[in-house]
Amino acid sequence: MGATPEGEIDRIVRAGGRRGEIYHRLRELRDRYAGLIRERFPRLSRRVSGFNLDDLLPERGFHVARALVGTEGTCVTFLEASVRLHPAPKVRVLVVLGYEDVVRAAESVPEVLQAQPIGLEGMDRFLVENDYARRSFRETLALLPPGNAWLMVEFGGETREEAVERARRLAAVPGAILVESPGEQTRIWQVREAGVATTSRDVRLGGDGWPGWEDSAVPPERFAPYLRDLLALLARHGYGAAFYGHFGEGCLHARIDFDFSSAEGIRTYRTFMEEATDLVVAYGGSISGEHGDGQQRGELLPRMFGEELVTAFREFKAIWDPGNRMNPGKKVDAYPLDADLRPPLRLADPPVAFQYSGDSGSFSRAVTRCVGVGRCRREAGGVMCPSYRVTRDERHSTRGRARLFFEMLEGEVVRDGWRSDEVREALDLCLACKGCRSECPAGVDMATYKAEFLHHHYQGKPRPRPAYAMGLVPWWARLASRLPGVANGLMQGPFSGILKRLGGIHPDRQIPAFAGRTFRDGFAPPTGEPTVLLWPDTFTNFFHPEIAEAAVRVLEEAGHRVAIPRKVLCCGRPLYDFGMLDLARRQLRRILEALRPEIAAGLPVVGLEPSCVAVFRDELVNLFPEDEAARRLSSQTFTLAEFLVHEGFEPPRRTGAAIVHGHCHQQAVMGMAADRELLGKMGLDVRLLDAGEADHYEVSLAVAERALLPAIRAAGPEALLLADGFSCREQIRQLTGRRALHLAEVVAGAAPSASA
């Protein structure tokens, strides 16, 4: 079905049969419409609209296979296909150019193309001015040159020198940056690739961003004037839009805040689509440059090609599908573009504990953030979604769980709401790692949704035993600290099996031992006014006081007077994992009241357990968004690394390799940039792992074996192991027999005063 010379067509037709009939009719169709095809088909590589009748022209080789590409299931079903591959360059480099606005970026496209790049993409400010980008790409955004729009220009070569040489002229433009590091290139491309999800919901657009006019294309030399006129058309209809796309090929991706909630909004949508079609045709372009026409744009094809060529499309389809059974109503004889718009969702919006300020306070809007991108189904890279990577079950992916919440709120498939066992079972293996919060382009936050669900699911009925054994660990720890020897004897001795069964703990788990003394017992308040408040969390205070003591030494080495809260306080971190939100709220209110003077004074708070810092930076402001004290405490709470970097602390030197296992909550909420910078200043060769590892015993073993344990084995016994999270250190100890250090211990151990 490839290129077919005229003589070969004659032979096929003479042979008869169904193939001969098809080729005869295709050639006859081509001959009748050849003049119109040559006259009206846009001359650009990104023309996806209509059928590829131009591939039947003699000068195109009568290529039947190409003529069928992009028919969108209306003519045939492909069973297999052969494709021609081109060798990829061995080395790539990236030049990024910043512009005042997206039109200025588009104006540069023809000149940039003269440098013969292998890729030229563009994006506007909406792709970087959103919560997902700020959370996930903090370090990457700092690499971008100043501007409100950017061109990303890729060059390739067989060697690094060859690729750099090809990029050199463009990289010399004022304000341009040359990115040679493959890792940094990947991170910049990820910002662009996240466009479809990051622009689907952005309050700066004025509403949700929708497809519809999302992949139009024009010749690259006409791209800028087309974009300028499209912006004017959008403004006339009161629409906002976010732009990105394949600028080097004149293909523009757009997310537009169409109003589908009212009859007037839908009428405006239709008018815009018709006028936008006329606009793109006037510039010699195509309604679709990538995604196809379907029903949404099929009705508009006569405006692009004229009625005669649409008749030719109809005849082309009839050759393959005389009964019109293949995807009817699409492309040919298309249903009206506004005939089958899904009505606004009528989802239940029950009262909730969290505020969901980014979703107008609506749980239904929060859980319907998912647009199906499926990044949670990746097999490697990042921390999302560890349970799915083990089970490979869609219901254990962030996307699958979001869909179950949708079904729960819709009430047709999942009918028992908060009491649903299907939803609870799907959430059971969720680690509440918050990985999706930072890595899902749509900003799905399954850890929060899980806490919300469990809060309601267990209202008025007993919770599973682990909820009481581990969720209430701050209270058990305070009791055990009075007689730690007795407590450890019970937990490590003959009665440990009974205690594990009572607490719902796997028999192969080891229960961590309480320290012989607490950190608070031995802490000496500073002389003089304190300059920093150290947060002695439950795990550090009762299990590892030596970490807090090391932190005090480091902070004093940095010139600070260290205080701690006057009362024993706990942020309630374990409570969220079990949905015990009423108790968690009470804990946070106690903290806000107890720390009122320190909060008012702006005293920095340094946390040592990443998940506790994450509570202050995330859950606190989600539960109390209108509380000024909550907002201030959130903004003045730091990890140890963040605080030391912010203060300009010069750490002591320490050489060697360091394997750093970042707590999943830290990676999701605070990031690891400060840790990387501080350890790098020390002279350590840092490898930051991208992995999760805790939760249900069997699942946690499988998750740990994916990245964490192989990395530790490969590092060798001489490498430093760093893990600030209590659960992370315990998992490493129990699975490898090695002790991972807290950052405070590493810095204090290298400090001159520590060895004095």
Indicate where each model-derived feature is located.
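Ferredoxin-type iron-sulfur electron-transfer modules and their immediate structural context
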Residues: A282-S286, G294-L429, K434, T448-P462, ...
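Conserved phosphate/anionic-ligand binding catalytic regions in large, soluble enzymes, centered on
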Residues: G61-H86, G245-C251, R255, I287-S288, ...
